[in-house]
Structure formats: structure tokens, C-alpha cells
């Protein structure tokens, strides 16, 4: 078997998220069916992490183990798979990697981008791709609020619970590091970018929702800073942005040089 690392882009609107579920309407399920059809046998893939229903990706990473009988040049893999995939899922990159590489456990961080539309009337082509917030709010305050998340914090207030957390929850379980943040406006769109070493369930959407509440003047920057820097055990931010505007842009890995590697444009 030969291990291959793939990068995938997908429109999350038709799917119930990344992770396989009964019924098969997830990105992972669709990809696994494409691999199994190509290999003639069941194939499991392993992603860098989950994306929720309606969340998009331009840089999701997963790995698969291909039979040695199917070793082809890396730049041939995207075409071989894309012909078996719906137009809402594309393989954009493939490379052979050492057997110890793991899409999830080898990752060192991720970058997410959230899109907000300020248009008075939402462009139909933004439906499901941007959060429509046409009422008055301050991009400057939004930027200040977003930058408060930089650094290492206990993100208790900005994490939803899946129900499968360890009990009791260990100390430091909600601690994460946000290394970079950015807010940029292009026309009627505002883009918020977070890069971090790891993200909790719904963390980006909860951070975005809280920052937007500050931009609307519904909470102060001081109140937001307290939730970030000194959360109480039961603190939970109630402001969760919808999945529509969220895109996984990139999964980060240590600098490595793999063998047969080519960027697919």
C-alpha cells in the first residue's frame, strides 16, 4: 500500500458535513465511494478534521492508502478522482507521502475564513456562502474584537459540546492558540480569517458571532475580553454565526519534502 495526501475543495451546501454518517450524504462518504470504485475494493480515507453541515473548504486535507497496483504519477490522481466526483467536490492536489504521515495527527494548525455580506439585499450567488448582516455595524470594532482572540486562551466560552467529551473534562481541554487574525473588506463583503494550532467544535462560528455582536454595540470589547481571558466554568457565548460563511482555507503541516509531488492548478 502507498500513502497519498490529497487536498480537496468542496461546496458544503449539499452535504451533512465531512464525517461519514448513515445515509452517505457527507463529503467523506462521497469521496470513499469514488476511491472504492477506482480501486475495486473498499477504501477508507482519513481527514484532517471535521467540517459541519453547510461549511465549505478550499484546503481540506485527507490521506488514503492506495494499492501498489494503482501507483500512478501524483499529478494524475486529481483527474482520476474528479471524473468520479460531483461538481461540488474537487481534488486539487495530490502527493505521495511517507507511511507515517497522518492528515489529522501530523497537522500543526488550520486557517479558516468567514465571509459576511453587508449588501442591503443578499446577492443570490452569495446564498449559503455568506452570512447576510445588512444592518449598521462597525468594521473597525469588528476588527478590534477579532484581534482580542489572538494568543493562547481558555476558549471555554467559545466551544460547543458534542457530547463525547471526556468526563470529567481535563484541565486545559479548551486551551487553544490563535496565531493570526485578519479582517478585510472587499466591496460589500467582510472577510474574517483565523489561523490557529487547533479549533474546538463551532469555535470559529462562536468567535465570529461574538465579534459581530461587539461590532453591533450589543456587547462591549471589555465584556468580550473577559470571556476570552477569564471565562467562568459555565460561561458560554450565545452568539453563534451560521455555517454558511465559513470555509476551511488551509491545513498546516511541518515543512517537509515529499517524493512525487506536484501542485495541480
UniProtKB/Swiss-Prot annotation:
Check the record and name the InterPro entries matching this protein: PsdUridine_synth_cat_dom_sf, PsdUridine_synth_TruA, PsdUridine_synth_TruA_a/b_dom, PsdUridine_synth_TruA_C, TruA/RsuA/RluB/E/F_N
**Keyword field contains Zinc:** no
Positions contributing to substrate binding: 112
> Keyword Isomerase on this protein?
yes
Keyword list (alphabetical) reads:
Isomerase, tRNA processing
Family annotation (SUPFAM superfamilies): Pseudouridine synthase
| Name of the protein described by the UniProt record | tRNA pseudouridine synthase A
Organism for this UniProt entry: Akkermansia muciniphila (strain ATCC BAA-835 / DSM 22959 / JCM 33894 / BCRC 81048 / CCUG 64013 / CIP 107961 / Muc)
